UniProtKB/Swiss-Prot annotation:
Naturally occurring in which organism (per UniProt): Picosynechococcus sp. (strain ATCC 27264 / PCC 7002 / PR-6) (Agmenellum quadruplicatum)
Similarity field: Belongs to the bacterial microcompartments protein family. CcmK subfamily.
Protein name: Carboxysome shell protein CcmK
Compartment(s): Carboxysome
Keyword Transport attached: no
GO biological process terms held by the UniProt record: carbon fixation; photosynthesis
Gene Ontology molecular-function annotations: structural constituent of carboxysome shell
Keywords: Bacterial microcompartment, Carbon dioxide fixation, Carboxysome, Photosynthesis
Alphabetical list of PROSITE patterns matching this protein: BMC_1, BMC_2
Amino acid sequence: MSIAVGMVETLGFPAVVEAADAMVKAARVTLVGYEKIGSGRVTVIVRGDVSEVQASVSAGTDNVSRVNGGQVLSTHIIARPHENLEYVLPIRYTEAVEQFRESVNPQPLRRV
C-alpha cells in the first residue's frame, strides 16, 4: 500500500478547518498538519492510501464553498513521496497524530 500525501490550500482559516473536517470524515486518512503561508493562505495536509487521499482531497475541496468567502487556491496529491520529504517538510506522522493514524488504519481482519 502506497502512503500518499494530499494537500488543500485555501484562503482563510475557517475554510481550511471546514476542508480538514470534511477530509477526515470522508475517507480513511490522517490529518498530519497544516501550514499558514501568509496573506490568508492556509494548507492542510493528510496522509493515507492513495485512493483514500484522492477521496479526501475531493471532499475537502467540495466543502470549502460552505464557508462564507471560502476559496480553494490549490490542491495536490503525491502518490509516493520520497522519504527525504518527510524529514524536511511538515508531512511526517508525529507522535501527536499517531493515535489517529491507528484508528484510521486498524489491523486487517484475519481469515479463518
